[in-house]
Every structure is written in structure tokens, then in C-alpha cells.
Amino acid sequence: MEETLATPDATRRSLSPSCSATVKSRAAGFERRTKRRLSETNASVREDREEAEEEEDEVKEKIEALQRIIPGGAALGVDALFEETAGYILSLQCQIKTIKVLTSFLQRIDQEDMKFGG
């Protein structure tokens, strides 16, 4: 049984059985490659989605940690929590500077007492 194939100039030519098998084989190979590429793409999309979910979980964990650390943080939304965190950090830095100044002052007093036999 002979098959025909349309050519670009719209004429028909006969295909031998071996040529027909080659065309079918190529089509099957194309279909396998297409399925494999689609499968790889789906796997990549799945991996991207999983990575995004993991990142989102990490962010949620960090926000929860901030809510535990910042006084009153549990009652705040994310935006207010970040603002409160910034203020809290500035407050802590100010306290550290104050403690350093007081420590330095007290050390000088102790040194002066030692000079005068105190």
C-alpha cells in the first residue's frame, strides 16, 4: 500500500513503505522529545513553586520571631512591626551608648579614688 505526501508545490508524490516508516519514526521521536521537554518544564515549575513556598515560610518564621522579640509585636501588622523594630533598635543603641558613658565615668571615679588612697 502506497501513501502520498503533499509537497510545497501542492503536487503529490508516492512514499515507499520504508519512507513512510521513517516519517512515522521521526514523528514518534518528536512526540517523545516534546513530552520530555514538557515534563522537564513541569518539574522546573514545580521546583520554582516549592522554592517560593519555602522562602515564604522562612519570611513568616522571621516575622513571628520579630513579633516575639519586639515588645507588643504580637499585636502589630507587618508594616507596623517593621517600624516598631526600627524604633526598638534605635532605642537599644541609645541604651548601649548610655551604659558605655556611665561605665567610663564610673571607671574614672574608681581610678581617682585609687590615686587618693580611697
From Swiss-Prot:
One of its GO terms (molecular function) is transcription coregulator activity. Keywords: Brassinosteroid signaling pathway, Growth regulation, Nucleus, Repressor, Transcription, Transcription regulation. Residues 43-92 form the bHLH domain. InterPro entries: bHLH_AtIBH1-like, IBH1-like. The keyword Repressor applies. Homodimer. Atypical bHLH transcription factor that acts as a negative regulator of a variety of shade avoidance syndrome (SAS) responses, including seedling elongation and photosynthetic pigment accumulation. Acts as a direct transcriptional repressor of two auxin-responsive genes, SAUR15 and SAUR68. May function in integrating shade and hormone transcriptional networks in response to light and auxin changes. This is Transcription factor PAR1. The gene is PAR1.
